[in-house]
């Protein structure tokens, strides 16, 4: 694909609005081709390394299925399956894997790790998730939004993110809004807003592209007229229980529930979540939250909303694979 060959995919702001749009168009085409049985393998003979310092369901499955569909082979290097950062430096690992593989995916910790891999590997490196950014997720989100509002451009869409916006999802949403011209509203307590420097940079770019970025603590004002309401988990399994109580107290008023959906005034509003979601007590963590904090029926989103007709979270999950496939095809095939 012209302009993408041998490029890295580390964060969205590394690309132009036109480049982002072309990736989304390619993803839509690859999805249609797969469903019609007309998919053409562009990556036959390619070898891909998947480095996972953090476990994953959607990201791993998306990369593996996308690679297999396109004729490539993969090697999975899990949290205990390589010497990266332990007995071998990131720099040396990059140079070793770059001699053996045609592309490298990294999912793990600091953004500096994936940047170092990209600097020294000599082959395309893709960011499957870092502490700072989650660009492949946003590609899937944008494709899903296009599919559910086919008559609208991004300039005509309003996306609300409710909850903890200071994480990799909040950062990548800012970058997506900057490039697409979305009306993005981060509805969160001020303590959970992203870093001011990134907000300023992305807001300026968004305005150039016909969009707007708003940060507010006011739920009613923030969600008014929204086309999509998005949230993510509040706590992680590895965090101390003291953090759980603090986070839940801070974010309880930002739970996505039927009241919030109604406050949009839009009967067609859709619900988005990058998953996994704690919408019931059917998981270990969900059960603990219900028992210890009275969060029966959901934490960041209620089970009622998650299971409603407004929920398009499984369309999102499927689109992880199609958009990741687009990234690999664009960067590995001429």
From Swiss-Prot:
Subcellular location as annotated: Cytoplasm
Assigned keywords, A-Z: Amino-acid biosynthesis, Arginine biosynthesis, Cytoplasm, Transferase
EC number: 2.1.3.3
GO molecular function: amino acid binding; ornithine carbamoyltransferase activity
Annotated SUPFAM superfamilies: Aspartate/ornithine carbamoyltransferase (SSF53671)
Listed pathway(s): Amino-acid biosynthesis; L-arginine biosynthesis; L-arginine from L-ornithine and carbamoyl phosphate: step 1/3
GO cellular component: cytoplasm
Reaction catalyzed: carbamoyl phosphate + L-ornithine = L-citrulline + phosphate + H(+)
Class of this enzyme: transferase
Gene Ontology BP annotations: arginine biosynthetic process via ornithine; citrulline biosynthetic process; L-arginine biosynthetic process
Residues binding carbamoyl phosphate: 56-59, 83, 107, 134-137, 274-275, 320
Positions that bind L-ornithine: 168, 232, 236-237
Entry function: Reversibly catalyzes the transfer of the carbamoyl group from carbamoyl phosphate (CP) to the N(epsilon) atom of ornithine (ORN) to produce L-citrulline.
Family listed: Belongs to the aspartate/ornithine carbamoyltransferase superfamily. OTCase family.
PANTHER family tied to this protein: ORNITHINE CARBAMOYLTRANSFERASE SUBUNIT F-RELATED, ORNITHINE CARBAMOYLTRANSFERASE, MITOCHONDRIAL
Protein name (Swiss-Prot/TrEMBL): Ornithine carbamoyltransferase
Lineage of origin: Bacteria, Pseudomonadati, Pseudomonadota, Gammaproteobacteria, Enterobacterales
């Amino acid at each position: 694909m012209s302009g993408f060959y041998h490029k890295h995919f580390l964060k969205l702001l590394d690309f132009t609005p036109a480049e982002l749009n072309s990736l989304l168009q390619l993803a839509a085409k690859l999805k249609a081709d797969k469903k019609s049985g007309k998919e053409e393998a562009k990556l036959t003979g390619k070898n891909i390394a998947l480095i996972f310092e953090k476990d994953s369901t959607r990201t791993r499955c998306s990369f593996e299925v996308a690679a297999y569909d396109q004729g490539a082979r993969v090697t999975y290097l899990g949290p205990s399956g390589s010497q990266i950062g332990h007995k071998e430096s990131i720099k040396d690992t990059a140079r070793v894997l770059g001699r053996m593989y045609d592309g490298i995916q990294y999912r793990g910790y600091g953004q500096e790790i994936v940047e170092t891999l990209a600097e020294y590997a000599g082959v395309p490196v893709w960011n499957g998730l870092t502490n700072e950014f989650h660009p492949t997720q946003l590609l899937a989100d944008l494709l899903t939004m296009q599919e559910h509002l086919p008559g609208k451009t991004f300039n005509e869409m309003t996306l609300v993110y409710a909850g903890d916006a200071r994480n990799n999802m909040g950062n990548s949403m800012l970058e997506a809004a900057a490039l697409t011209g979305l009306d993005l509203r981060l509805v969160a307590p001020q303590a959970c807003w992203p870093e001011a420097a990134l907000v300023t940079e992305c807001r300026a770019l968004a305005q150039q592209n016909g969009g707007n970025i708003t940060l507010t603590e006011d739920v009613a004002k923030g969600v008014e007229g929204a086309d999509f309401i998005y949230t993510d988990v509040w706590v992680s399994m590895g965090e101390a229980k003291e953090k759980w109580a603090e986070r839940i107290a801070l974010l309880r008023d930002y739970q996505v529930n039927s009241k919030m959906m109604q406050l949009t005034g839009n009967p067609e509003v859709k619900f988005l979540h990058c998953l996994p979601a704690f919408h019931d007590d059917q998981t270990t963590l969900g059960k603990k939250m219900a028992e210890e904090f009275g969060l029966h029926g959901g934490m960041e989103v209620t089970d009622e909303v998650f299971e409603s007709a407004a929920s398009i979270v499984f369309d999102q999950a499927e689109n992880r694979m199609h958009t990741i496939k687009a990234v690999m095809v664009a960067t590995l095939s001429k």
